[in-house]
């Protein structure tokens, strides 16, 4: 096993969910600084976009982001296979198929969560991607759609995609309601059923199972790891990113670093992007939650939110934002 594959294998325990409009390359670099051992995921990119679009913009990444997975959307096996081959050329560590997004636009394109009703098609897609690349092909899914209330149906879906070659499943442990709820509501309203994911792992001990959904703190995340191979943080990693750092530190028996130190570690990357003509707001929007719940946290967000969009804004604005925080919040909490 090479160092890169060993690092990829070790990253199974903690990952950051693919989140549209959030987990872009700038966010992922920041998350890598917070969580050196975590597995990172891109935003979902449709297979057609990978094949025909501006790849540098859509799937380009900084080498520091490894281990990194590309999440693909789509339901055409041939197109997904072609996109998977491109992903291998670009150096990704994993390809993940989205079978969990419930948005109307995604449904209209016949991909995302609605694919849970077509397990044979998903299996065909997985098999095609496996034939096109040596990278591990994984699937992110829900427990079911709409009123599905049948563990056996969920388990059969998983068994079909695993038989086709899926190396791992990420289970968002709630149903997707395809009508009547927004994507945001679909992350909150359908009840969580962690026990289904636990049972899946118990009955299939050789299958890597990663649990996603409603994980917002270190202690519950560690408790979930008694029943699953990994945990995937979603909104918590974005709105309160220090939780991501603390969980990565706990899992790897490393001391937690002060928030200010983590932010300053981001400075060289930010300044390199500024030098290329990118606006400050593209980087700082991902750090707004770093002082969540801390003295001065609201003022920190306000300074960055109001100033980062201005022409010529630079790192000095981040320094101004830091000055608004209470320095006591920078200490390491025992």
Curated annotation (Swiss-Prot):
<protein>
    <recommendedName>
        <fullName>tRNA-dihydrouridine(20/20a) synthase</fullName>
        <ecNumber>1.3.1.-</ecNumber>
        <ecNumber>1.3.1.91</ecNumber>
    </recommendedName>
</protein>
<feature type="site" description="Interacts with tRNA; defines subfamily-specific binding signature">
    <location>
        <position position="301"/>
    </location>
</feature>
<feature type="binding site">
    <location>
        <position position="140"/>
    </location>
    <ligand>
        <name>FMN</name>
    </ligand>
</feature>
<comment type="function">
    <text>Catalyzes the synthesis of 5,6-dihydrouridine (D), a modified base found in the D-loop of most tRNAs, via the reduction of the C5-C6 double bond in target uridines. Specifically modifies U20 and U20a in tRNAs.</text>
</comment>
<dbReference type="InterPro" id="IPR013785">
    <property type="entry name" value="Aldolase_TIM"/>
</dbReference>
<dbReference type="GO" id="GO:0050660">
    <property type="term" value="F:flavin adenine dinucleotide binding"/>
</dbReference>
<feature type="binding site">
    <location>
        <position position="172"/>
    </location>
    <ligand>
        <name>FMN</name>
    </ligand>
</feature>
<feature type="site" description="Interacts with tRNA; defines subfamily-specific binding signature">
    <location>
        <position position="184"/>
    </location>
</feature>
<feature type="site" description="Interacts with tRNA; defines subfamily-specific binding signature">
    <location>
        <position position="298"/>
    </location>
</feature>
<dbReference type="InterPro" id="IPR001269">
    <property type="entry name" value="DUS_fam"/>
</dbReference>
<feature type="binding site">
    <location>
        <position position="71"/>
    </location>
    <ligand>
        <name>FMN</name>
    </ligand>
</feature>
<feature type="site" description="Interacts with tRNA">
    <location>
        <position position="187"/>
    </location>
</feature>
<keyword id="KW-0288">FMN</keyword>
<feature type="binding site">
    <location>
        <begin position="234"/>
        <end position="235"/>
    </location>
    <ligand>
        <name>FMN</name>
    </ligand>
</feature>
<dbReference type="GO" id="GO:0000049">
    <property type="term" value="F:tRNA binding"/>
</dbReference>
<keyword id="KW-0560">Oxidoreductase</keyword>
<comment type="similarity">
    <text>Belongs to the Dus family. DusA subfamily.</text>
</comment>
<dbReference type="InterPro" id="IPR018517">
    <property type="entry name" value="tRNA_hU_synthase_CS"/>
</dbReference>
<keyword id="KW-0521">NADP</keyword>
<dbReference type="InterPro" id="IPR035587">
    <property type="entry name" value="DUS-like_FMN-bd"/>
</dbReference>
<dbReference type="InterPro" id="IPR004653">
    <property type="entry name" value="DusA"/>
</dbReference>
<dbReference type="GO" id="GO:0102264">
    <property type="term" value="F:tRNA-dihydrouridine20 synthase activity"/>
</dbReference>
<keyword id="KW-0819">tRNA processing</keyword>
<dbReference type="Pfam" id="PF01207">
    <property type="entry name" value="Dus"/>
</dbReference>
<feature type="binding site">
    <location>
        <begin position="212"/>
        <end position="214"/>
    </location>
    <ligand>
        <name>FMN</name>
    </ligand>
</feature>
<feature type="site" description="Interacts with tRNA">
    <location>
        <position position="98"/>
    </location>
</feature>
<keyword id="KW-0694">RNA-binding</keyword>
<feature type="binding site">
    <location>
        <begin position="18"/>
        <end position="20"/>
    </location>
    <ligand>
        <name>FMN</name>
    </ligand>
</feature>
<keyword id="KW-0285">Flavoprotein</keyword>
<dbReference type="GO" id="GO:0102266">
    <property type="term" value="F:tRNA-dihydrouridine20a synthase activity"/>
</dbReference>
<feature type="active site" description="Proton donor">
    <location>
        <position position="101"/>
    </location>
</feature>
<dbReference type="GO" id="GO:0010181">
    <property type="term" value="F:FMN binding"/>
</dbReference>
<keyword id="KW-0820">tRNA-binding</keyword>
